[in-house]
């Protein structure tokens, strides 16, 4: 299941995202964040972190550097401006 999910994100990253333009206000991009979150924390926690990240990726958020937390307890760390 994890491989299928990661392949889906990779497909989006290379084939769909370029058509939509580079709109992500974060570094790493949301798709890179999703891949890292799923690899680091597994499917359930990784998808939860990805969901929270995508909700923040909108024009009213400052954006900046927002790396995947090393543990879920640290997931409320503030985003750093770049």
Curated annotation (Swiss-Prot):
GO cellular component: plasma membrane
Cell compartments where the protein resides: Cell inner membrane
Membrane topology: Peripheral membrane protein
SMART domains recorded: Haemolytic (SM01234)
Keywords noted in UniProt: Cell inner membrane, Cell membrane, Membrane
Main location: membrane
Recorded superkingdom: Bacteria
Function: Could be involved in insertion of integral membrane proteins into the membrane.
Family under the similarity heading: Belongs to the UPF0161 family.
Protein's UniProt name: Putative membrane protein insertion efficiency factor
Originating organism: Rickettsia typhi (strain ATCC VR-144 / Wilmington)
